[in-house]
Amino acid sequence: MNSIINRRVLIKSLLLSLFSSGFSLADSNNHKKFTIIFGSCSNQNNKMDHWQTIINYKPDLLILLGDNVYGDFNNESANQLKQAYKKLSENSNFQYIKNNIPIISIWDDHDYGINDGGRNWEYKNIAKKLFLDFFSVNSNDVRYKRDGIYNSDEILLFNKKIKIVSLDTRYF
């Protein structure tokens, strides 16, 4: 278990260090720019200035890598997680982002519901529904019907399809 956690931390850290807060891709033919911002570890109980910073970059896509809220809970009411999502949803900058910038999101342990949680977390399906509902995933989406929230999304970038695969390293 410890080596799995260390690998997750290492992979997440490498991704974040590679891309820092984001990066831009340019089309050499017509100098268009496409900006992607990566984010994670957004504790709703701290100052949330980072949402304004994201808006200032005017990204074309926001990829949230987990710990989008900190809502660890220990019973089926999941009140802590519900309150965490509620607090984030009340942030005007996050509201702007959610309404104006495409978001691809995956969870990590704190939006999964338990610190360092994995496949044996008894309330993982409660956390899953709250996550999908919060990020306005269409109710017909396959993630509502299958285990986990892993997914692949395609974006069109300079007339080329880019596939972004989000792995669920908690549910399984």
Question: Which ranges hold each PLM region?
Answer:
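Active-site neighborhood of divalent metal-dependent phosphoester/pyrophosphate hydrolases
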Residues: H31-F172
